[in-house]
Amino acid sequence: MKYILVTGGVISGIGKGIIASSIGTILKSCGLRVTAIKIDPYINIDAGTFSPYEHGEVFVLNDGGEVDLDLGNYERFLDINLYKDNNITTGKIYQHVINKERRGDYLGKTVQVVPHITDAIQDWVMNQAKVSVDGNKEDPQICVIELGGTIGDIEGMAFVEAFRQFQFKAKRENFYNIHVSLVPQPSATGEQKTKPTQNSVRALRGLGLSPDLIVCRSSTPIEMAVKEKISMFCHVNPEQVICIHDVSSIYRVPLLLEEQGVVKYFQERLDLPINDCSNNLLFKWKTMADRYERLQKICSIALVGKYTKLRDCYASVFKALEHSALAINHKLNLMYIDSIDLEPVTKAEDPVKFHEAWQKLCLADGILVPGGFGIRGTLGKLQAISWARTKKIPFLGICLGMQLAVIEFARNCLNLKDANSTEFDPNTPVPLVIDMPEHNPGDLGGTMRLGLRRTVFTTENSILKKLYGDVPYIEERHRHRYEVNPNLINQFENKDLCFVGEDVDGKRMEIIELTGHPYFIGVQFHPEFSSRPMKPSPPYLGLLLAATGTLNTHLQQMSKLSYSDIYSDASDDSFSEAKFAELDIN
């Protein structure tokens, strides 16, 4: 087993996750089996109870793990399915050690950070690195480990010490350290500064780790003189200093790394079994990156949500939309609308903001209402849903978005004016959305319906069923505490809003579709978590197809084409069979 540790310096949010994912992509393109581990040095057990404004979205895994959004990058780049234990937190490690101490596993010894915490970290990494993540049940050959935060943070000291020890346990030929640092370029001078990187590497070396590769993040390509200066002061060869400057899309990052010879250096330093890197995975990434830059037709989607001030709150939603837009040769114009800005209260307090929000909504080719929690902003979401339904604008509701679509239809089409969710009004006379029976209202952490669940289609006449390839059932990831009340489903009989997907027991409503509408779909699950750059999520793809007026054409072609891994390389949005390029990443 080979271990690649990715650390960061100077500032957080420098792009370690994308760089680590790109490293994994390059190695996978060489025929190697790659897994990934993300270390978050916070004391929380997992990311499940975080505010979206703290760390962005909570990414959900197949096994129900609520983890850092960087694991989403790993899954998308590497096309793998990780587990909750691939996300290590300080809280998990301490909980594990304390539980062992309570059981008496330490035989009365004084439990300390060194060696007990550091040993637990090393054992966790070694055990999880062996777990197969790509479906073929073969053990991974390489584990890419990202250490969150920056070198020098007090929260991460135990992890740095653990890896200082681990490099000797694993042996030099099996352990590799990549340090990602910032090379700022002040506008006043325009000169690229190396001092922050020098200090960061000095701090890293002072803690017992020496970088094998220094990745310099910069706004523009770094000059050779700057690279040589970093090489001299950081005790590495010039070829061990590479640059990742700002690029048009993240699809360029693996290509930048490959162009600078990292494969050859990995092969020599880690003695990797690489004979021929002719795998066409990187070629596909280049195809995607090139196409991304030449897209001209634009598709505008309005995202009506509660957490629009921080884009990372909807990171996977954005990626799923981007994957779908790229697949149909359109540039995505995602317009973020704070749902509360659509409400009358904003009209009274800030008319300009109110009219700007409604102008965005009116200009949108499609409308998306994602998941969320709490009553704030729900009126604005209901108004956006009503607009999409009545104006026949393509609409996709995710989780809460689906629940609100059912409520909006009940209020305005079934004359159930008091229809509501018990999340917003526990005493509502028409509880159309209710708390699930298994939900424990005492604690918030880990009390939701989480992870991969099966949804069975109940009709053959379903747009979404066709988009999924006419399969009898699908499996998607869930994260919710509330569900449509099964006792009130009879109210919708013979109405235009149809429940076309249910759970395996036929008790939970999973998918809704509105007949007579170009595309009005709601899903209780979160399909964005399963979207991949070369395998766009069907519900999101359907939204983009409907928004560009090509849904019917695409559905007609579905009988002739294999849905999985279809990737068009056409310069327009025509869906003729001859213009589809099959990009099989296996």
Swiss-Prot record:
Keywords: ATP-binding, Glutamine amidotransferase, Ligase, Nucleotide-binding, Phosphoprotein, Pyrimidine biosynthesis. It is an enzyme of class 6 (ligase). GO terms for biological process: 'de novo' CTP biosynthetic process; CTP biosynthetic process; pyrimidine nucleobase biosynthetic process. Residues 300-554 form the Glutamine amidotransferase type-1 domain. PROSITE patterns: GATASE_TYPE_1. The keyword Phosphoprotein applies. Pfam families: CTP_synth_N, GATase. Its EC number is 6.3.4.2. It comes from the Eukaryota. It catalyses: UTP + L-glutamine + ATP + H2O = CTP + L-glutamate + ADP + phosphate + 2 H(+). One of its GO terms (molecular function) is identical protein binding. Pathway: Pyrimidine metabolism; CTP biosynthesis via de novo pathway; CTP from UDP: step 2/2. The modification Phosphoserine is found at residues 568, 571, 574. The active site is at 399 (for gatase activity), 526 (for gatase activity), 528 (for gatase activity). InterPro entries: Class_I_gatase-like, CTP_synthase, CTP_synthase_N, GATASE, GATase1_CTP_Synthase, P-loop_NTPase. PANTHER family: CTP SYNTHASE, CTP SYNTHASE 2. NCBIfam families: PRK05380.1, PyrG. This is CTP synthase 2. It comes from Rattus norvegicus. The gene is Ctps2.
